[in-house]
Regions:
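Alpha-helical membrane segments of multi-pass proteins
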Residues: 1-211
Length: 211
């Protein structure tokens, strides 16, 4: 699946279509390259995952790397250069591939606290950049028109809000599920205690046990 997606992304016609629009360039092409990276590392053997985990405690290193890549690639000048320079385009795609792999290997290990810290930095940055694209009276990217720039800004603000809501829903679901499991465990422990007490009382009144 990962190799098929990579092959598709390397098709010149698709690449040209994705980069012809500023919002498709950032909102579609970026996530697709990251998805390919995530799929590539999905089948890593346990030994390789353990080796990566040595320098990626709690997913911090991977998430910092992912955040750095995305922050750099949101700079308008980088988008312009990627369109006219093949080495920079290749570096951009490789960085997104690695960012997707790092995100896949780091997200679950990070836990809710580190995830919240990561999203608490990335999502406001996305929203601020998006609002700047919307409000700017000047073209920030020479290769794209002003209305396309504003459209990208709207997409970034919407995506940041949607990701924030989605993660908060996940947190609420996890907390509710944890509380339900705790209540079930407490109820099971209480039932086991009652059964044990009933067994002791039954043995105490059993003549054969008394004798």
């Amino acid at each position: 699946m990962a190799l098929a997606l990579l092959a598709l992304l390397l098709v010149p016609a698709l690449r040209q279509w994705l980069t012809a629009s500023m919002w498709r360039h950032m909102v579609l092409q970026f996530p697709l390259w990251m998805l390919a990276g995530a799929w590539l590392v999905a089948g890593l053997p346990p030994a390789a995952r353990a080796h990566v985990a040595r320098w990626n405690a709690h997913g911090i290193s991977g998430l910092v790397g992912t955040g750095t890549v995305l922050a750099v690639l949101m700079v308008p000048r980088v988008l312009d250069l990627a369109l006219v320079s093949l080495p920079i385009e290749a570096a951009k795609c490789a960085a997104l591939l690695l960012a997707g792999a790092a995100l896949r290997l780091s997200w679950r290990a990070a836990g809710l606290v580190v995830q919240g810290f990561f999203l608490g930095n990335m999502l406001p940055m996305m929203a601020v950049v998006g609002q700047l694209y919307i409000d700017s009276p000047l073209r920030l990217c020479n290769a794209y028109l002003l209305d396309d720039q504003a459209r990208l800004g709207a997409w970034l603000v919407t995506a940041a809000a949607a990701l924030a809501v989605g993660w908060l829903v996940k947190v609420v679901w996890w907390v509710v599920r944890r509380d339900v499991l705790v209540e079930q465990q407490v109820a099971q422990a209480a039932q086991a205690t009652e059964k044990a007490k009933a067994g002791v009382a039954s043995n105490a009144h059993d003549p054969a046990t008394i004798n």
